[in-house]
Amino acid sequence: MNHPKIIIPTKVVVQNDAMHDTTSPGKLITETIPSDRIVDVVIPDELKAVLSEVKTIIWNGPMGNYENGFTEGTLELTKLIADTGAFSLIGGGDSVALIESLGLEQKFGFLSTGGGAMLEYLAQGTLPGIAVLESQE
């Protein structure tokens, strides 16, 4: 997917899906990710230059296989975004919990534990519950 305003990291660490071994370093991939692999850590190095120039950041969910202990990419991205000064909208319970655990809530413009709902609202301009309430006015 190529779009000047949507940035998808190109370097990731992947691991065999069957392993679920958080002690293995995995394998750095800079090409197509094989279908039998899962992303363990997204390396956001290439995002540093871009993030220093943007005015708004929308981020939903952790980077990679966060639930199984692979937190490096998510931690680094969190700190990068916190230091940009850009207005940021962050969605997803894991992302918000991490930001809160680091005490960085004040560095972000908007935090939502409902990441999918946040994205739906941004895309559609409303949510089903809001639409019902608005139609009853």
Which residue ranges define each predicted feature?
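Active-site loop-to-helix "anion-binding N-cap" substructures in soluble metabolic enzymes
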Residues: M1-E137
